[in-house]
Regions:
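A residue-level marker of the well-folded mature domains of exported/periplasmic proteins
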Residues: 2-7, 12, 21-133
Length: 133
């Protein structure tokens, strides 16, 4: 749970840097909905958001584990005007163009778990390593 809270705190700090003190909307994008790992990450993110206050976590993802489905979700989040996107990518390269579009619009982008190619994110957080798995 501490890793999940640290993760959301890092994303929130990125989203808050240079912005007014209003509610920060952070999208937590899973590889697919219904996966226990991502559901647990959402629980931790929601708890951390509650502790921080003025942070809204939007947990979302596709119903299938395809890059195309994830890109559709990302386009919707850009249209909503979220402040930050934290994504576990289904394809590290395919999501880069849409995430570049997000960053051009001022949205902070963090990849976690399964990374995004460097051009499509500002930081990557690896919540574990092979020795711990």
């Amino acid at each position: 749970m501490k890793i999940k809270a640290s993760f959301i705190l890092t994303v929130a700090a990125l989203a808050l840097s240079g912005s007014a003190l209003a509610e920060v909307k952070i999208a937590l994008v899973a590889k697919s909905l219904g996966n226990g790992f991502f559901e647990a990450a959402n629980v931790g993110a929601q708890e951390a958001a509650k502790e921080l206050g003025d942070v809204k976590v939007i947990y979302t993802g596709p119903t299938t584990t395809t890059a195309e489905a994830q890109i559709e979700v990302l386009n919707g989040l850009i249209a909503q005007g979220v402040d930050a996107i934290a994504i576990s990518a289904n394809d590290p390269d395919a999501v880069v163009p849409v995430l570049k579009k997000a960053m051009q619009r001022g949205i902070k982008v963090v990849s976690w778990d399964s990374g995004v190619a460097a051009g499509g994110r500002q930081i990557h957080l690896n919540p574990s390593n092979n020795q711990l798995i």
